[in-house]
Structures are given as C-alpha cells and as structure tokens.
C-alpha cells in the first residue's frame, strides 16, 4: 500500500497544492514554519480521520477561508486504487469519504490505511503521565482491531456513568447498592476484554521493540518495556469490591484498566524518564514506533505508511544513519520524512545507495526538486 497523490485545499498554510509521490522515500525540506509537518498531518488525516496534533478540526482551515479539503489516492495493488477525502466547512460536520461514498461511522475507516508517525511531540509518551502511554497502546490495537475501539468507547462510557453515580450518591448521602452492582458487572465484563487484548498485544509487541532498539543503539545499552495493570495482581471484580469505600470518598472509580501504564527503564531497571539521555530517549521512542510499524505489517499483511518528522534532532550521526538504512530497506514500504537541510537528507540516502524524492517547501507551497 502506498499514497500515490495528495491534494490540499485551504488546509493550514496551504491554499492549493497537489503532490505526486514515490512509492519509496519522500522528503519534505525547508525552514521551520514553512509547512513540512502540515503535509505529514494531512496524510495522517487521510489515515486516521483526524490531526495528529490538534483535535479541533476547524482550526486546520486556512486563515480567511471557510473550509478545507484533503484528498489522497492510495494504491493497494497494481489494479486497485482508493480515493479518500476529508473535508470540513465551518460550523458543519466533518465529511469523510472513500471513493465518493460517506462512511456510516468514522471508526469504520480506522485501520484500512495504517500509518505510523514519529514526531518530537512523542517525547510526551516518556515524560508525561500514564494517559499518554495508554493512548499509544490503544492507538496501535485500534488500527488492527475495530472491535477493540468499540469496547474501549463502551468502557469509558460506563466509567463516566459510574463516576456520575458516585457523585450523586455523595450529594444525596444515599448509595443504591443494587445499581452499583450493575455498574460493576458491566465494567468487569468490558474491562476484562480490554485487559486481555492489551496483555496479548504487549506479548507480541515487546520482541519487535527489543529488536529495533538493539539495532538502533548497536546494543550500547539495555532497555526494558513492561506492561503494568492492577488486573495483573487481582481480579477486576475484587478490586472494585475492596475499593468501594475509597471510590465513594473520592467520588470516582480508582481501580481498573484506565489505570494501566507502560514502564520504560534503562541500565537494568532505572527509569528512562530520569536516567536516559535525550538521545537515548529519542532512540527509545523511535524503537517504539518502529515496533508499531512491524506489528501493523504482521497483522495487516502489507506495509503501513511511515512518517518521520524531524527525527534527526538529538541523534548522533551513527544512529541517524542506522535508522535511515533500516527504514529504506525493502522490508519497509513508503516513507515520508521532514528535514530543514535538503543537502543532509540527500547525502544520507546517497551514502546508503537508496532513491529519494525531495520536495522543497516554502510558505505553504511544495515543489519537487529536480
């Protein structure tokens, strides 16, 4: 699968632009703020129905305009190509179409054109709270299992209802134990399904991660990745039962898979967040995302798109070259990369003997360099 063509109308800082891509590696080069990352975000829209950076769709309409449209032509086989479009008018619902037909639900599109994106913002997976790491797990599983996304939505809805019930009980000083048991039963059923899928996913995912990190670092340091969940140590039903008084006092659900986390460590168990250098943290993140790529490829049977935004920052030349050698291998599919230095990216690919198509980006316009 690869993206053959991308067209933008009134999207972010682009008025109108159409680009024809290589099925191998494509680079967007130019100064910061020119619009390189906006092109990656447009591709992300076509894959996942939303921006990678900003969930408010209306803020992606070009200043002074009333709407935007992003269109792409995906080629899955030599004989099969799909036209995907996303459009939005101010104060109206977002429209998402495949071959000019609307999707009944946006969730039906997720996973059809899988994508992995690596950006400087991803450092939040390491430095921020557990919610960011759960989002990472859920994003990966959702692109390979549509039912997982539905189950996750259902779980979040029940948690919200249970928390509202606990708040009402605190206000009235009356607790309906029968209704609480219904919420608990629903939560246990759905939560156990999510826990089982997350646990199975991590067992498959971890070997991919280790392989990629060892390659990038050339076995320079030992890192570990562990899945943490309250359900690893007790049943969900028992956790809810034993924490009932605590939940009443807090007026929220204190235990469950919404407390799951990933533990990242380096140097035999030291927290990566505190003891990893910026280069080691970036190598860890890239290995995570490349493991996501390998997981998608195994599950889907074809290569997803790989988007690399400003990945050279904070990496030494050796690790940079190893990453580019890896992703430009025939085992990988189509790649999009941004860099402020056209000569640098051109030289890297010349050194490893791989073709690359370079687009010069200036003030919301992108043109192929000949």
At which residue positions do the language-model features occur?
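Conserved NTPase motor "head" modules and their coupling/switch loops across ABC/AAA+ ATPases, GTPases
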Residues: 1-31, 174-305, 314, 318, ...
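Conserved lysine of the Walker
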Residues: 36
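Post-Walker A helix-loop "phosphate-sensing" segment adjacent to the P-loop in P-loop NTPases
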Residues: 45-57, 291-299
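Nucleotide-state sensing region of NTPase/ATPase domains
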Residues: 48-126, 130-132, 141-144, 148, ...
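Structural recognition of the conserved hydrophobic beta-strand(s) that form the central parallel beta-sheet
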Residues: 72, 334-341
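A conserved P-loop NTPase coupling/switch region
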Residues: 103, 107-115, 119-185, 189, ...
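Walker B catalytic acidic pair
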Residues: 309-311
